[in-house]
Every structure is written in C-alpha cells, then in structure tokens.
Amino acid sequence: MITRMNVVQRGPMTLDEFLAWERRQELRYEFDGFEPIAMTGGTLNHSAIATDLVSALRGRLRPGCRVYRSDVKILVAGRVRYPDAAVTCSPVDGQSDILPNPVVVFEVLSASTASVDRVTKNAEYAATPSIQRNVMLEQVRIGATVFARDGANWVGTVLLDDAVLVMPEIGIELPLRDLYAGIELPPPETDD
C-alpha cells in the first residue's frame, strides 16, 4: 500500500469492497467512489463548534429525530462520507455503522477540506434524496453556507453573525451565535 498525502493508493474499489475493507481498519476513511481517503484531525475550534452543534441540536430536535456525530458514516451518491454531524428522523438499527436517510448534514469547514466540502460533498448531498439541507459552518468567523431543497432546486444561502439557522425539516431554529459561544475566532481581515 502506498500513501500520498491523505489518500491511500489501493486501486479502484467498489462501494461494497470499500465497506468490507474499512470495517477492518483502525482509522476512519471516506470513499470517493474509487479509493479510500484517510480522515484527518481538526483544530480545537473545529471540535468545539461540532460539539456545540450536537449539544444544541440534541435539546431542540422534533420528536422522532436524532443527531449523530462524525463517527457515523452516510452513503451518498455511491460514496461514503463522515459529516461532522447528521440528523435522521428514520428508525435506525443501533448495531449498524451506516446512518440511514440523513435529513440534514453538517460540515465544519477547515482550510484543508473546504473546497471538497463546498463543491464535491455538496453535490453528493444534493444528489441524495433524503438530504434536505446541508449546513457548512465557518471556523474563522460566525457564519454558515446553507444549501436546502426548494422543489427541484438546491438553493444556497449565506448566514452571518446574528442570523438564525432555520431548519423546518427537523423543527429547529438555532441562533448561529449559539454555536460559537466561548470560541476564540481570529480577528476579521481588513482591506488595508
């Protein structure tokens, strides 16, 4: 096995081959449809935002829905992803390692993965019928980019500062600032 950055080179795999292979690994891997990609660690802010998100969701979700952290995989467009959090409102098999029918997925953006999260994963989430909303949370400022279904369209909106994240599919309205309480953000860039 040859590794290149965070990509394990094994040759093209099928989804079933990947799932069988990954269950035997100590580390977590995403699957891009061809090969395993090792999951990397995050910053303290990334972890704090994701933790605050899960805590905020858990106490507000409508009955029948449950939030899961980043150690549970989802299947999207023939690929395997580990979002930072995901909500399902469907019954689950507690022994499974695959979350069925995610309704809302959340990614905390990192410098090293933001382009994949914004483009590749967003397209995969849009192609997954159960996913109604993809929330991408910033790590360097209070902000989110939200894509949601509007009929046949996948429509993006940017939320900043005092905005409220409205997610009717899971019965939640969440002030964005709640996810950043106590988190030290870098100073805003100036146009000097």
Which role does the model predict for each range below?
Residues M1-D192:
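Gly/Pro/Ser/Thr-rich low-complexity, intrinsically disordered segments predominantly at protein N-termini
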